[in-house]
Regions:
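Bacterial N-terminal signal peptides that target proteins for export
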Residues: 1-10
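C-terminal motif of bacterial Sec signal peptides marking the signal peptidase cleavage site
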Residues: 20-22
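Metal-dependent phosphoesterase/phosphodiesterase active-site architecture
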Residues: 26-168, 174-175, 234, 254-405, ...
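Active-site neighborhood of phospho(di)ester-bond hydrolases with catalytic His/Asp-centered motifs
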Residues: 116-118, 176-181, 228, 233-238, ...
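Active-site environment of divalent metal-dependent phosphoester hydrolases
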Residues: 124, 184-186, 240-245, 372-374, ...
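Short coil/turn segments at secondary-structure boundaries
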Residues: 128-130, 189-192, 247-248, 377-378, ...
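Core catalytic region of metal-dependent phosphoesterases/phosphodiesterases
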Residues: 149-265
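Active-site-proximal segments of metal-dependent phosphoesterases and phosphodiesterases across multiple
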Residues: 373-393, 400-449
């Protein structure tokens, strides 16, 4: 009996010890989850009205360096910047009657306040099918293939979201809208990181399932998440449904993306048809290296065997339908972020919404990216703007409805219009000229907002009859990329004026990055890329920002309708 009692006591003690150990482990796990890295922004949150980011010129004695020589950036003066004074609003009367003067006109009523972000390009730097190699020589405009900022795309978005939250506390937004190219390579895991950052989830920007790297850019962190009071909406961009933003993913590309071998592809820079060829391995980032060294990239002849990586099925390409579906897998509002559940079945990425109760205004979200069938016009790729008859007919119906219902209208699309024929696919039906001519028949259309070019350009699209029908003119405002310098987003404040015209105030904002943070490092690398890669001059150089008051004439009907706001 004594032996049995001792055994029983021993068993009980053992169970208690195991339970205590389990509790300790659970406590450690809880502490671990609460101690996740966070990247708070700077205490002072300003817009470019107050302060701008001005790049410092590279010393004339510095050598030309290649984009991948990141460790040399600071040594030779690449990527340096300084804060500078802010820039005010430039008052634009381009689409107003020629005799119009705003001398005695005052801003009287606030109608709508919202923000736009675009071209975030969340990038899986360990994917075997990015196009890194084509950007390593610093050729013109090829920073789209590689830039040293690509390991930090998740961190920049997190900083921008926190900046929005701080501005929202000062003056609430009615909504926010993201203008396409949420991701870089049409991958599921890139899309999940994007949505999860906006939802405030834990982000692990490391897609190698066997990696133990702890460099700052792959370390798990807790995203802040967009303030839950702010509704956000989504636009489809070419990178969201095309491989590298240019090609419908072929079966070979789809297989490679989830495989263990780095993509071997032909020189698609010289000839887009080389997508089916071979000759160059695209490379990946060595995430154990401080500066994100590129490995497994170069001519096929330089390798004795194909370079390998660890496969991950979450890197898979997503169709339009699958891309839309992920916006229903979100904890922020609204459900689906503008898309209908029916669009999951159809892949139709157009919709409308009315952001403010009792305000006669609707936003028309238009998918103006090329079709997935890969049938492009001469010299066009999937990076061009286009409509097919279905989307054009839908757009016309929505414009007709908005006009007949007496509502002001904003079109939100990814690709801009009216900036040159090179931007629009010649195979589009309608043509760009036909589209613009149709838009000019709607006096209630006030604004077209877009991204795509990574610029902060503002374009006036004046009425075809400026003397008799000035209200047929409208404005186009582009929002720069969070990936490339100037790494900014935009605020919009639409106000009623004392003469019942309206003014659209648009303001650029730099994410309020904290010194020493990954997002601050990204800003420096973005500036360095703009100094290394030759290309078209940056609009509004050297800061790339542009703030404006855009005045728009309304019809007599709409002037009467909004005069009490």
């Amino acid at each position: 009996m004594k032996l049995c009692n001792k055994l029983s006591l021993l068993i009980i003690v053992s169970i208690l010890i195991l339970q205590l150990v389990g509790c300790a482990n659970n406590t450690n796990m809880l502490q671990s989850s609460t101690q996740l890295t966070r990247y708070p922004i700077a205490d002072e949150v300003l817009t470019t009205l107050d302060r701008t980011v001005t790049p410092i010129s590279v010393p004339s004695t510095s050598p030309k360096i290649l984009p991948g020589e990141v460790s040399k950036y600071s040594q030779y003066g690449y990527g340096k910047w300084q804060p500078d004074e802010g820039i005010g609003f430039q008052k634009r009367l381009d689409i107003m009657p020629s005799a119009y003067t705003a001398t005695s006109v005052t801003n009287t009523g606030n109608l709508l306040r919202f923000f736009t972000m675009s071209d975030i390009h969340i990038t899986d730097i360990q994917s075997p099918a990015q196009t890194i190699y084509f950007g390593l020589q610093g050729q013109p405009v090829m920073s789209s293939a590689y830039s040293a900022i690509i390991p930090y795309t998740t961190h920049v978005l997190d900083a921008a979201v926190q900046t929005v939250n701080a501005l929202n506390k000062k003056q609430a937004f009615d909504f926010g809208i993201f203008l396409g190219d949420a991701v870089n390579n049409n991958q599921f895991n890139e899309l999940r990181w994007y949505v999860d950052i906006l939802d405030g989830q834990v982000i692990t920007p490391n897609s190698d399932p066997e990696s133990t790297a702890s460099t700052d850019y792959v370390r798990p962190f807790k995203a802040a998440g967009l303030d839950k009071s702010v509704s956000w909406y989504q636009v489809l961009g070419n990178h969201d449904h095309f491989w590298s933003g240019v090609y419908p993913p072929t079966e070979r590309i789809k297989k490679t993306i989830v495989g263990d071998t780095v993509l071997n592809v032909g020189d698609v820079v010289k000839d887009s048809k080389n997508i089916d060829g071979t000759g160059y391995y695209m490379g990946v980032v060595n995430v154990s290296s401080e500066y994100g060294k590129i490995i497994s990239a170069g001519p096929e002849a330089s390798f004795t065997t194909p370079p390998k990586i660890n496969a991950n099925p979450d890197r898979r390409s997503v169709s339009r339908n699958e891309w839309i579906a992920e916006f229903f897998n979100s904890t922020s509002k609204p459900v689906g972020h503008g898309f209908s559940r029916d669009s999951i079945k159809t892949g139709f990425a157009c919709y409308t919404f009315e952001p403010k109760v009792n305000l006669p205004l609707k936003v028309i979200v238009l998918d103006d990216s090329d079709n997935d069938n890969g049938i492009f016009g001469l010299k066009a790729t999937g990076a061009n703007g286009a409509l097919d008859q279905e989307r054009y007919n839908w757009l016309v119906r929505e414009l007709d409805r908005g006009q007949s219902e007496g509502k002001l209208m904003i079109v939100a699309a990814h690709v801009p219009i009216g900036i040159g024929s090179y931007m629009w696919d010649s195979a589009s039906s309608p043509t760009e000229n036909t589209l613009i001519a149709k838009l000019h028949t709607y006096p209630n259309l006030i604004l077209w907002i877009s991204g795509h070019r990574h610029y902060n350009s503002v374009t006036a699209l004046p009425s075809p009859d400026p003397v008799h029908r000035p209200e047929l003119g409208f404005w186009e405002v582009e929002t720069a990329s969070l990936r490339d310098f100037p790494q900014q987003f935009r605020l919009f404040d639409i106000v009623r004026n004392s003469d019942n015209s309206i003014s659209i105030f648009t303001t650029n904002v730099d994410p309020a990055v904290k010194q020493g943070s990954p997002a601050a490092k990204s800003r420096s690398y973005g500036i360095a890329a703009s100094q290394i890669f030759p290309g078209p001059p940056l609009p509004y150089a050297p800061i790339g920002a542009y703030n404006a008051e855009l005045v728009k004439q309304l019809s007599a009907e709409m002037m009467a309708k909004i005069k009490t706001y």
